Amino acid sequence: MLRVPLCTPLPLLALLQLLGAAHGIYNVTQRTFKLDYSRDRFLKDGQPFRYISGSIHYFRIPRFYWEDRLLKMKMAGLNAIQMYVPWNFHEPQPGQYEFSGDRDVEHFIQLAHELGLLVILRPGPYICAEWDMGGLPAWLLEKQSIVLRSSDPDYLVAVDKWLAVLLPKMKPLLYQNGGPIITVQVENEYGSYFACDYDYLRFLVHRFRYHLGNDVILFTTDGASEKMLKCGTLQDLYATVDFGTGNNITQAFLVQRKFEPKGPLINSEFYTGWLDHWGKPHSTVKTKTLATSLYNLLARGANVNLYMFIGGTNFAYWNGANTPYEPQPTSYDYDAPLSEAGDLTKKYFALREVIQMFKEVPEGPIPPSTPKFAYGKVALRKFKTVAEALGILCPNGPVKSLYPLTFTQVKQYFGYVLYRTTLPQDCSNPKPIFSSPFNGVRDRAYVSVDGVPQGILDRNLMTALNIRGKAGATLDILVENMGRVNYGRFINDFKGLISNMTINSTVLTNWTVFPLNTEAMVRNHLWGREASDEGHLDGRSTSNSSDLILPTFYVGNFSIPSGIPDLPQDTFIQFPGWSKGQVWINGFNLGRYWPTMGPQKTLFVPRNILTTSAPNNITVLELEFAPCSEGTPELCTVEFVDTPVIS
């Protein structure tokens, strides 16, 4: 307890300062972060301030590695980080909130604070970020007519409930309240969206102010064009722009100045690389080009956020997609200064040298790249085909419907749904099956008749398929959700069979719809079990008409070598001879693999999901083709290597 001698008179202000310091509040109440319009800058505690920040997505990095990545950012000379909060990551079902483990956003922000990093918060509700549906939860689509990112009452009710949960958690973390959050973004690149709904923006401003107060700086970010800023910002929101090395810096900031004649120049997303799509080459930005452009930005006195400073991984099913439909791969490496695995790159050191020209960078050793280990090949054996495993994949039973139901109609938001019916006519001579009146396969469908693979229907390419079978034969269509569109007007991306299926002009009816809980099956039935000998060694049809297999689960185990210090270590898994599917290790969903499409050939395996105390389980769901058959089971292997392959 602070004791002030009564015989020593003190000025009232000095007494309040002592009392405030004793209770830990004085420094908090004096903390300020403001816009200085008169001199085109920020003021932090009354002193001129310029941030050089980097984007990091806690939801793409295991909690185990948060501190390592943040410390590397600090040592690069950054004084702030920028971060999104994806709504769907924290509210997977209406009213079901998750804020623990890898979802503990408050801990992540506190960790940044402890390391001396300020935080630029971007809580959405829409975030883009190449993340499924731009961070909006898929259950919003249960109201099929909903207009997302607008003043649609159904949307606003859901947004209001979410903000009432999230923003009160953020308020104690604001800079003026003793935390690290200096600015908060409202929405995200709203000027790129067709709605241009100012009532929606006003609603958000009102709710942000209600929950966070009037002292925090609220801002917007849009592409550096007048059209985008016209619809993307609003009075009382500070307008910023984003652009990469290919843009003219002067012209980009002239656009900002038309909306913000005074105040700091800000590039909220200065692109260090770019996103990838399956089937396209890996995107890169040359280090020299990036470093030169960063120097020019900083020489103008601009505040800069490097997007991304570390990309991370789209674990599980979290990747987004663009239109025309192009899903993003599991890796979100982004050619960033820190690699997907958190490794230091030439780009990291080049940017650090530039930053050092404008501000002091921390002294001391930079945390090294984490060691990697090649655990070698692991043999896998067949567990069951998807059709054989329906009893455990769909324990609550299927849903009956005259016509196909979408994923959201059966409350299956990610992964896979199996649609089953019977052929209404003889198809001994091949007849085409397709979706009518438009291609309603969302996104990729694996078709079989009486257990014989027929082929693949695809949202973009394979819109019709000839099938064979007798009248009354069982038709199975396994539909994969490959990631929802995260940008543009088509983010209301329904999944499954979203229109009727037709054979020879006959509409197929009387469907049995199986929502597949692959996560529960892997955790409860495959994790920790020995590789199974039941069934055939693979799911291949005996028919020679197709090289495809039935979608099949494969399992295997491997042990961490003994006698080697510091194991387990990070690694990468690759799939020689495999085609496309999903992989889990010890019940953790690493994401999608698709080496036949590329550019990503390996998946990052963080060491925190591995164990030395028991064999490590690998579960693979292969959808198209496995390298092994009954005669060559030794070919059914995956391999752990110490170097990523992305080209």
Curated annotation (Swiss-Prot):
Is the Glycoprotein keyword given for this protein? yes
Q: What class of enzyme is it?
A: hydrolase
Alphabetical GO CC annotations of the entry are:
cytoplasm; extracellular space; Golgi apparatus; lysosome; membrane
Pro-segment residues? 25-29
Tell me which positions the record assigns to the signal sequence.
1-24
Annotated substrate binding sites: 84, 130, 188, 334
Kindly identify the residues recorded as the active site.
189 (proton donor), 269 (nucleophile)
The positions flagged as glycosylation sites are 27, 248, 500, 504, 510, 544, 557, 617
Give the subcellular location.
Answer: Lysosome
What family is reported?
Belongs to the glycosyl hydrolase 35 family.
Q: What is this protein called?
A: Beta-galactosidase
Q: Which UniProt keywords apply?
A: Disulfide bond, Glycoprotein, Glycosidase, Hydrolase, Lysosome, Signal, Zymogen
Stored Gene3D superfamilies: Galactose-binding domain-like, Glycosidases
Kindly list the cysteine pairs connected by disulfide bridges.
196-231, 628-636
Question: InterPro entries given for it?
Answer: B-gal_1-like, BetaGal1-like_ABD1, BetaGal_gal-bd, Galactose-bd-like_sf, Gly_Hdrlase_35_cat, Glyco_hydro_35_CS, Glycoside_Hdrlase_35, Glycoside_hydrolase_SF
Question: GO:BP terms for this protein?
Answer: galactose catabolic process; ganglioside catabolic process; glycoprotein catabolic process; keratan sulfate proteoglycan catabolic process; response to cortisone; response to Thyroglobulin triiodothyronine
What molecular function terms (GO) are annotated for this protein? beta-galactosidase activity; galactoside binding; hydrolase activity; protein homodimerization activity
Q: Which domain of life is it from?
A: Eukaryota
**Function as written in the Swiss-Prot or TrEMBL entry:** Cleaves beta-linked terminal galactosyl residues from gangliosides, glycoproteins, and glycosaminoglycans.
Q: Which reaction does this enzyme catalyse, per its entry?
A: Hydrolysis of terminal non-reducing beta-D-galactose residues in beta-D-galactosides
**EC number(s) reported in the record:** 3.2.1.23
**Quaternary arrangement and interactors, per the entry?**
Homodimer. May form higher multimers.
- Record lineage: Eukaryota, Metazoa, Chordata, Craniata, Vertebrata
Main localization, broad class: other
